[in-house]
Amino acid sequence: LGISRVVLPRESTIEEIRSLSGQGMEIEVFVHGALCVCYSGQCLMSASLMGRSGNRGECAQPCRMRYELYREEMQGANKIPAQGAYLLSPKDLFTLHELDALLDAGVSSLKIEGRMKKPEYVAQVVSMYRAAIDAWKQKRQLPQDAQKEWDLRKLFNRGFTKGHAFHASGRAMMNPIRPNQQGVVLGGVIAVSDRRITIRLSEDLHQGDGIRILGKEEDAGCIVNRLYKDGKLVAHAKKGEVVAIDRKIPARRHAEVRRTSDSELQQQLRRTYADCRKVKVSVHLTLQVGKGLVCRMRDEEGFCVER
């Protein structure tokens, strides 16, 4: 058929990947990011319920919504108690530590899910996988950088899973507790007044960071615009210190506080791509019946590519 590359579905196992890589075609696999709860290309839930087709890049993510579980019986439907309400929400795929197995299996291209993600997230994820690829090419041990993985969690994660490729299933794949950014543990609430929330920190905190205070029913989040230490405004506070923030969100004593964005980390990552040269291009697409799609791109200096 003249096929040069095949993009495998996310439910492919490492054994299937290894088998298919010997068929004379390049193999592309999904290695990181958001997972679909359904078989690839077969989820019609978003299109049916909300008129937005997941197969056309418009998924409204109904799998990230709250659900209840029922068992149908002769007497009617009985609700089944479940841990959490987000029963269809998968964790995020994370295969950095298994990347050597994928590359050894013959994978030619790695796909990272970046839909609706910030450039800082893309910079961090791509740099980590790039370093791992380079180590594999040079026959070195894959990097085990705990700090970078911690930073990645601060940027975005729903919990991590190795995915179907490495036979994860059930609780190893799903996160029914929360469908959004989990962040990392920042500390705990030790006091709540009419005006302020007092927190004991287990990590450093900076003005401009995003936090979430976990609740029994719902969580509440905000940006730390003002940070107080010993009654005085400060720009940052260190692990182990007691600080206060303005009470803009609900909070209760002993509630866990999580950091959902790190302003210092984001600034560091922006610097890694701030000087990247951007080139304006014009794109011309040609589609004719019976012929393939032709894409022609030309930059301001007249250089042109076509495929």
Task: Set out the residue ranges of the language-model regions.
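Surface-exposed amphipathic alpha-helical tracts and adjacent flexible/coil segments at the periphery
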Residues: 3-307
